């Protein structure tokens, strides 16, 4: 890895960020979109979620109206989708994916009034409280909403390389992977029975989930010699307030 980075004129950390976030990650999205463009979309609804969204036979969320105008008229609707994913383990249909990608730039706090801001915060709480929270948080991260809207401090840990002898992933992916493991204690019956029972013995799991989500947030602003845990602890109160806690 180091030799490849050096041959291309980068240090390892710079190379990884350039390669993964500006090449590999976008390639994944474009490849997915090309694949879906070649498929016939399942538009037959089997269940209504709201007056604007429904579910098809593949458990995908589909628009019940023109997706082009659906989000352009009310971008807040995007956040409800991730709440449904977390609560019911639904999937995103291709029209929904493209519509989110086309309108994600409208997802900026300065464009949202106070009443809508409260609804957006409620949607995040529904994501955290949902049974499939890690899946939904990954999607929020993939579309850029986790860092660009909910937790701006998350930008600083995106692609941030860590000690390769302990961590296999950059910091943001490491956090999401940790959330996957935590979520597995809730939905996977084959996980360690002791840990599973310990997890289910916790009455309110919100604090635990948020702790895992934010446990490395201090790494993004750390300078040499600084304690990342203390830095993160100072950031957390303001982050939680922004999230509506």
Positions of PLM-derived features:
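Divalent metal-dependent catalytic cores for phosphoryl transfer on phosphate-bearing substrates
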Residues: 1-32, 170, 195-245
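Non-catalytic interface/linker regions that flank or bridge core catalytic/transmembrane domains
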Residues: 1-165
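Active-site-adjacent "gating/activation" loops or surface patches in catalytic cores
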Residues: 51-61, 142-159, 170-212, 217-218, ...
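Alpha-solenoid helical-repeat scaffolds
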Residues: 72-75, 172, 226
């Amino acid at each position: 890895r180091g030799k490849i980075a050096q041959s291309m004129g980068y240090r390892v950390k710079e190379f990884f960020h350039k390669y993964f976030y500006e090449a590999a990650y976008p390639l994944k999205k474009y490849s997915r979109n090309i694949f879906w463009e070649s498929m016939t979309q399942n538009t037959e609804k089997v269940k209504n979620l709201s007056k604007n969204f429904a579910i098809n036979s593949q458990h995908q969320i589909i628009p019940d109206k023109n997706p082009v105008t659906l989000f352009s008229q009310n971008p807040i609707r995007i956040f409800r989708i991730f709440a449904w994913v977390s609560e019911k383990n639904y999937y995103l249909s291709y029209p929904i994916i493209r519509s989110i990608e086309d309108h994600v730039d409208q997802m900026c706090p300065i464009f949202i009034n106070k009443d809508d801001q409260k609804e957006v915060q409620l949607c995040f709480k529904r994501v955290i409280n949902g049974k499939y929270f890690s899946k939904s948080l990954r999607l929020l991260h993939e579309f850029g909403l986790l860092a660009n809207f909910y937790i701006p401090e998350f930008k600083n840990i995106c692609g941030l390389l860590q000690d390769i002898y302990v961590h296999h992933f950059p910091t943001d992916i490491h956090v999401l992977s940790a959330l996957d493991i935590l979520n597995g204690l809730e939905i996977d019956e084959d996980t360690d029975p002791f840990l599973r029972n310990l997890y289910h013995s916790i009455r309110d799991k919100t604090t635990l989930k948020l702790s895992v989500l934010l446990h490395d947030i201090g790494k993004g602003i750390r300078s040499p010699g600084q304690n990342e845990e203390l830095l993160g602890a100072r950031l957390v109160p303001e982050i939680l307030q922004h999230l509506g806690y």
